[in-house]
């Protein structure tokens, strides 16, 4: 299967939106949150023995799933590109929630890539690729006009984040393990360099960065009692900036 061909793919994920009264809007928002929660908590945590957060979609942080859904809907994304598949927990979740969106996931470890490929072999919208994430992004990212990048390949000795960001030209990049300035959320540091706004803007000087508003009241609590990862939501281009600025779950980090 080759979803990411040179001809590209134009797809839209179904996302319920209501018109009419605010009451109707609230009902739809509630139903969507319930739908996401069912998919989120039914996803097997295959990475539970590997990752410090116990695995699961988005490190078992359902608030990250809610924010991602808002980004996807408001951006009208035409692809999801994930780096750092591991065993496919997040990929599994995304493939079920957005069955009409092409999803590319990149993993450098051969055994993990093969596990994820077998796990997701029945998902026609998913392609798992073994390889260097920045190299794969360079070859594929330009084929889409409104992609969401989920960059989570920055845990090994080789930190590919800078090279990944150098390939991003449009859309929204979600950077995992980012320093959001809150004690509850962890972040990565390699060779004395923290995963922070300065690191991102070295590669994307014209970008704008948002982070989660920790005071936002979500419909469901986050059940991750261990390590929670901070995340940056990076807008490249005016459409992406307009998208992120419209999401009440986020706050500007600039």
Model-identified regions with their sequence ranges:
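A short alpha-helical cap/connector motif
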Residues: 1-148, 153-254
